[in-house]
Amino acid sequence: MPEDVFKALADPTRRHILDELADRNGQSLFEIRARLATKHGLGMSRQAISQHLAVLEAAELVRTRRQGRYKFHDLNTAPLERIATRWLRTDAAEENQ
């Protein structure tokens, strides 16, 4: 599981997508595409962004929900929190001494 998170975070485009979802959750593919183009100068196809979103979903960093014909994407910080907690736990540091 952490390997999927690190793989997802390794790509700068996926980090931009996560930044955009952190700024405004619940975006459609069209909205994400427009924000990447205007704010980051990334003119990408819908298919390319969909592939990036699929990697983020596999790592559980993004959750999707459907409303009618539309699919909305939300940031899920739980995988990052699990990794950070594991590394920052004070009892884990004491065990290693």
PLM feature spans:
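Amphipathic alpha-helical dimerization/coiled-coil segments
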Residues: 1-3, 19-23, 76-97
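Compositionally biased, intrinsically disordered low-complexity regions used as flexible
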Residues: 4-5, 57
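N-terminal helix-turn-helix DNA-binding core of bacterial DNA-binding proteins
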Residues: 7-8, 12-45, 70-80
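Short, hydrophobic-biased segments on the C-terminal half of alpha helices
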Residues: 53-54
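Beta-hairpin "wing" of winged helix-turn-helix
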Residues: 57-67, 74
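Hydrophobic transmembrane alpha-helix bundles
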Residues: 65-70, 84-87
